[in-house]
Regions:
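Alpha-helix-loop-beta-strand connector modules within alpha/beta enzyme cores
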Residues: 38, 42-61, 95-113, 145-170, ...
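Conserved N-terminal beta1-alpha1 strand-loop-helix module at the mouth
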Residues: 1-69, 75-76, 117, 123-127, ...
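Glycine-rich phosphate-binding active-site loops on the catalytic face of alpha/beta enzymes
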Residues: 79-91, 132-142, 179-203
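Hydrophobic faces of well-ordered beta-strands that scaffold small-molecule active sites
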Residues: 4-8, 30-32, 57-61, 82-84, ...
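Glycine-enriched alpha-helix->loop->beta-strand junction motifs that scaffold or abut catalytic
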Residues: 24-28, 51-54, 76-81, 101-106, ...
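Catalytic cores of alpha/beta
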Residues: 19, 65-77, 115-127, 158, ...
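Glycine/Thr-rich beta-alpha phosphate-binding loop at enzyme active sites
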Residues: 120-152, 199
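Hydrophobic, well-structured mid-protein blocks that either form specific transmembrane helices
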Residues: 70-120
Length: 208
């Protein structure tokens, strides 16, 4: 079954934990967004893992260099997953993968900025990434003509474990499920909802 990941793009640890508390019954993976980590530091990861020891905690570092070092930092802080940019060099990804093996954790490669996402997805899985996040960032989503259907189609063609992030909501969740994605990543559809718990519950039920 496709897992549900909440991407928390808030700026304060206490706000992130408060949101996670509301949605935790329906979420498999809790993602600390890049702005949150930059705002609050590694302590946000440690606090989230302490609050939810039975959930997977995903640190969206978007690492572009020093893969082994940054992965070690994330894992020692309590993260179960770290993101490395797919647009970076293979050696950076491989370094993070080596660190992940030591800690029994996972590397996720983020395809922001990658032109041929399907090709790169296959390459980085071969390097040892656990899965690949087919990701349209907030800026790309705001561009005229953007459609999550592009990511859904790519997931169907990839033939490797992928997640989809970039406009996952109740309108697109069925397509995400049918694509074969291992994880559906919802951000604003949950944290921007009037009732985040109800929004998360509806998405989780749609994936069942």
């Amino acid at each position: 079954m496709t897992k549900l990941q909440v991407a928390i793009d808030l700026l304060k640890t206490e706000d992130a934990i408060a949101l996670a508390t509301k949605v935790a019954p329906y979420i498999d993976i809790i993602e600390l967004g890049t702005p949150l980590i930059k705002s609050e530091g590694l302590g946000a990861i440690t606090a989230m893992k302490a609050a939810f020891p039975n959930k997977k905690v995903f640190a969206d570092f978007k690492t572009a260099d020093a893969g082994a070092l940054e992965a070690q930092m994330a894992f020692e802080a309590g993260a179960d997953y770290i993101t490395i940019l797919g647009a970076t060099g293979d050696s950076t990804i491989a370094g993070a993968v080596e660190a992940a093996k030591k800690y029994n954790k996972g590397v996720v490669v983020d395809t922001i900025g990658v032109k041929d996402r399907v090709k790169r997805a296959k390459e980085v899985i071969a390097l040892g990434a656990e899965f690949v996040e087919l990701h349209a960032g907030l800026d790309e989503q705001a561009e005229p003509g953007y459609s999550i259907q592009v990511l859904i189609d790519e997931a169907s063609r990839a033939g490797v474990p992928v997640s989809i992030a970039g406009g996952v909501n109740m309108n697109s969740i069925e397509g995400v499920k049918k694509s074969g994605a291992v994880v559906a990543v919802a951000g604003a559809a949950i944290y921007g909802a009037e009732d985040p718990a109800a929004a998360a519950k509806a998405l989780k039920e749609a994936l069942a």
